[in-house]
Amino acid sequence: MNKIKTDIDGVLIIEPRLFRDARGYFFESFSEREFEEKVTPILGHSVHFCQDNESMSSYGVMRGLHFQRPPYTQSKLVRCVKGRVLDVAVDIRKGSPTYGKHVAVELTEDNHLQFFIHKGFAHGFAVLSETAVFQYKCDNFYHPEADGGISILDDTLGIDWKIPTDHANLSEKDTKHAMLKDFDSPFDINVDLYK
């Protein structure tokens, strides 16, 4: 596993080791031991995943920007197993020097990249291919009462979703999230969300 730090602490791009031959390829999509050895020292704490999710979406679908409020916060490790998505993490930790900034990475079935999103970030993605199958690991179970989000269409975030606005397909719930300027974040950079 090769880990790539981004411009925002707590967000990492992970490149798995692929073994290719005439039959195709093989890789470990997740190894708790390797994650603990290589990622934990960067984060400064362990992450223990407990739930795997998978979604299938068509071109233009935009999901996000989601998070779970304390005490049910989630870290995520995400990847695209079929198709292409633009995946984004937005720092929403009050007091963070990168508050409101984002990291975007294209995840595809060909590059096999994974994206680690720290607690205290809003997460979302847009489907760039005809269809996409998206998988993500979470370190806390889903709690609908703690569900939260900021608008995926907030222009002030400066995210180029690579989808024309007239092709964007959002759930009704995602159209109702607040813009960042109207959002009171439940996260603070000085509060350890992993205790």
Positions of PLM-derived features:
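Conserved metal-binding segment of the jelly-roll/cupin
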Residues: L107-T131
